[in-house]
């Protein structure tokens, strides 16, 4: 899958004595900001079938929402954008909506990996300045795509990372200076992506520690239940 492909690319770069740079992008309320007109135009291009468009148009149009609080309902408000969450079609339509994003990245050394609304860009190089330039160019391209497609990047929740060996981190400066429309992107030593914590030396220590904590917690709960339920049930 996309996550294993991404980590394999990081490992290949480390084995080739290169440095990888990645930016983990956070799209603000991504599912809620999908523009219906743009989505329908993209569906027409992908499906090449105008007969099915009325179905999708009716699926998206005339939706309302209201709030229930303390036994009372608010007035209904029209839903003018976004795809229905909790539905089967919602995530599929969103993936089709952002499917053309990688095509707008002009620097072809930069790869774009998308897992639903988790978008990661990465590249690798033996020269750190080249790494910096490629990632910043890609961020500018993505910002332009987001403006055109009514998406919003949250620079405070977006993170960057330099992935290389621990020895290279110690002997050389590996600090990225990236920004999204003038807002600095924080560089981190580890980041959780789709449940997997990736660290900047690929030693997987943060992931192992988190996994051990979860296992320890579950074992403790099972030990407390040993006097309540049978051994077979605990298995």
Task: Label every model-predicted segment.
Residues 15, 91-126:
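Active-site palm subdomain of RNA-directed nucleic acid polymerases
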Residues 71, 152-189:
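Short, conserved micro-motifs composed of acidic
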Residues 182-235:
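Basic, alpha-helical interaction scaffolds
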Residues 1-4, 22-24, 67-93, 122-128, ...:
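Short, conserved non-catalytic motifs in the polymerase core
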Residues 6, 26, 43, 56, ...:
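Mobile genetic element proteins and their domesticated derivatives, centered on retroelements
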Residues 2-13, 132-149, 216:
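Inter-domain linker/hinge segments that demarcate the starts of reverse transcriptase
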Residues 1-84:
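Conserved pre-catalytic core of RNA-dependent polymerases
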Residues 30-46, 119-144:
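Catalytic palm subdomain of template-directed nucleic-acid polymerases
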């Amino acid at each position: 899958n996309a996550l294993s492909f991404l980590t394999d690319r990081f490992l290949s770069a480390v084995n080739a004595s290169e440095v990888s740079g990645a930016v983990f992008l956070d799209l603000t309320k991504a599912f809620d900001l999908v523009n219906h007109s743009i989505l329908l135009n993209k569906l027409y291009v992908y499906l090449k079938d105008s007969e099915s468009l009325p179905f999708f148009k009716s699926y998206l149009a005339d939706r309302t929402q209201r709030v229930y609080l303390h036994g009372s309902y608010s007035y209904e408000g029209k839903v003018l954008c976004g795809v229905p969450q909790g539905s089967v079609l919602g995530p599929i339509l969103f993936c089709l909506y952002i499917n053309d994003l990688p095509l707008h990245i002009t620097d072809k050394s930069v790869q774009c990996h998308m897992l639903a609304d988790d978008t990661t860009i990465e590249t690798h190089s033996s020269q750190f300045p080249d790494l910096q330039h490629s990632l910043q160019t890609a961020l500018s391209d993505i910002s332009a795509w987001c403006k055109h497609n009514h998406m919003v990047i949250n620079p405070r929740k977006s993170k960057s990372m330099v992935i290389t060996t621990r020895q290279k981190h110690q002997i050389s400066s590996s600090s990225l200076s990236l920004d999204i429309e003038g807002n600095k992107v924080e560089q981190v030593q580890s980041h959780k992506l789709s449940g997997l914590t990736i660290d900047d030396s690929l030693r997987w220590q943060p992931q192992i520690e988190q996994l051990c904590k979860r296992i320890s917690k579950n074992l403790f709960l099972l030990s407390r239940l040993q006097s309540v339920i049978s051994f077979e049930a605990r298995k």
